[in-house]
Design a protein with these regions (language model features):
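N-terminal active-site segment of His-dependent metallophosphoesterases
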Residues: 1-68, 75
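Active-site neighborhood of phospho(di)ester-bond hydrolases with catalytic His/Asp-centered motifs
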Residues: 6-7, 43-47, 77-84, 104-109, ...
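Divalent metal-coordination and catalytic microenvironments
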Residues: 8, 28, 48, 63, ...
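Active-site environment of divalent metal-dependent phosphoester hydrolases
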Residues: 12-13, 51-54, 81-92, 111-115, ...
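Metal-dependent catalytic neighborhoods of phosphoester/phosphodiester hydrolases
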Residues: 15-17, 49-67, 82-107, 273-275
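Accessory, non-catalytic peripheral segments of nucleic-acid enzymes
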Residues: 37, 304-450
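Conserved catalytic scaffold of divalent metal-dependent phosphoesterases
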Residues: 101-243
Length: 450
């Protein structure tokens, strides 16, 4: 069975107030052509179809038009599962209509049983070619309720186990049901998931150069009015909303080793889990933060048979929009902007830039770079200044102004570091930050509401 594995489209995303409709439209057209080109019999979308739970009409129209366009191809199966950015209810709402078109949607596990998560995949002639255990993003409470609503799990377990044990049990249960459905047929069994797995292979190597030196970078909120609303929830601007609880650090042993492939979503970089070629993240086809600007984007073409190692081809997604992140002192930033302008004159492309002042004296980047930014073929969306530069600020007024550089997430990290008496970039601080940042953001949001 040959299929395309993709995830984390985040349709409707407006990173730093950028309208990305044309960019996402170009990707969907390209994806359809790639599906036809590789002869994919199925498409698996592993969560985060949309960027928010209430996506715009434009985003929803793009999604449904794309699904409809696949009816004209030989891709006879589409599997869509919900992610943490999605509304499971919204995804599930048209399931009856989509099901008739062999487009299977599992927005959430609410009001479902184990059997409802098992989907048989068929070719254009109606012959079975595989089975998919379609598991969406699950919050801890949803998983607990899932088993409380069931008389018992397939193996007789109960809902009193830990959340990580319940997740492992659910994957075991759906796999066991898939085995029963397969019978004596020789067809592969795959699964989906939208979660944060531990021990990601390749991710650190891919992004280490990109993120080097960025840990001390903070937001210059005084430069662009209203920008804070568009800043990512994570301190490193990768657009991934943290998963709180035990489901936020899933071990590879959670997935039955007999599964022929596990298609994951949530991480925006193409990665293997624990160096296991059968358990992979496709990554997002789009840049979700300026620190991702230089990372290539992929979809995965997977060819899998029962009991064999899958053949996986990384297909690079062409860029429809260019993102650049430049760092250095003022003169370095000026030169990089001049070079970029020359490149865009020779080869025009819609381009957005993030500037990081990481050395030299504290200056207003608005004033210092006005000549290099005004009337050019690119748009600078953000100015930032590193903490190292801010530490050199001498005057009281500049010190007061420098506090505006920090986001609420930065202050939360500093609070954790103070309580732990650790450096704010230490592993201990990072672990606590990752564990509680979503709860912190939720509390801040509710405080603003009430």
């Amino acid at each position: 069975m040959k299929f395309i594995h993709t995830a984390d489209w985040h349709l409707g995303n407006t990173m730093h107030d950028i309208d990305r409709t044309r960019e996402t439209g170009a990707f969907l057209e390209w994806l359809k052509s790639e599906i036809e080109k590789v002869g994919a019999q199925a498409l698996v979308i592993a969560g985060d179809v949309f960027d928010v739970v209430n996506p715009s009409n434009i985003a929803k129209t793009q999604y449904y038009k794309f699904l409809a366009s696949l009816l004209k191809t030989n891709c006879s199966n589409v599997i869509v599962v919900g992610g943490n950015h999605d509304s499971g209810t919204l995804l599930d709402a048209p399931a009856g209509i989509l099901d008739a078109l062999n487009i299977k949607v599992v927005g959430s596990i609410n009001n479902r049983k184990v059997d409802d998560l098992i989907i048989e995949l068929k070719d254009a002639q109606g012959d079975a070619i595989g089975i998919c255990c379609a598991l969406p993003f699950m919050r801890d409470l949803e998983l607990e309720q899932f088993y409380k609503n069931s008389e018992k799990s397939v193996d007789g377990g109960n809902a009193n186990a830990s959340d990580s044990d319940l997740l492992k049990r659910l994957y075991a249960d759906v796999y066991r049901c898939a085995i029963e459905l397969r019978g004596n047929r020789t067809i592969p069994i795959i699964a989906t998931g939208h979660l944060y797995a531990s021990n990601l292979s390749g991710r650190d190597a891919e992004i280490s150069d990109v993120r080097a030196g960025l840990d001390n970078v903070t937001e210059n909120a005084n430069t662009f009015a209203g920008e804070n609303a568009a800043v990512s929830e994570t301190s490193v601007d990768d657009g991934v909303r943290e998963v709180v609880g035990t489901l936020g650090n899933v071990d590879v042993s959670t997935f039955p080793s007999e599964l022929d492939y596990v298609a994951l979503g949530h991480i925006h970089y193409t990665s293997m889990v624990a160096k296991n070629p059968k358990v992979r993240y496709s990554g997002s086809p789009f840049v979700m933060g300026f620190d991702e600007a230089n990372c290539k984007r992929y979809v995965l073409a997977v060819d899998v048979e029962q009991g064999d190692a899958p053949s996986v081809e990384k297909i690079e997604v062409p860029k429809a929009v260019r993102f650049e992140q430049f760092k250095g002192d003022v003169e370095t930033l000026k030169q990089k902007l001049r070079n970029l302008e020359k490149e865009l004159i020779a080869k025009p492309m819609e381009t957005y830039v993030d500037l990081l002042l990481t050395s030299g004296e504290f200056v207003s980047l608005n004033d210092a770079l006005e000549a290099e930014e005004s009337g050019k073929h690119f748009v600078v969306k953000r100015h930032r200044i590193s903490r190292d530069v801010l530490r050199g600020v001498a005057s009281f007024d500049d010190c007061v102004e420098s506090t505006k550089q920090y986001t609420k997430e930065d202050y939360f990290r500093m609070l954790i570091a103070s309580n732990l008496q650790e450096n704010d970039e230490s592993d201990a601080v990072k672990n606590q930050y990752d564990k509680f940042i979503s709860l912190f953001n939720e509390a801040v949001s509710k405080a603003h509401e009430g």
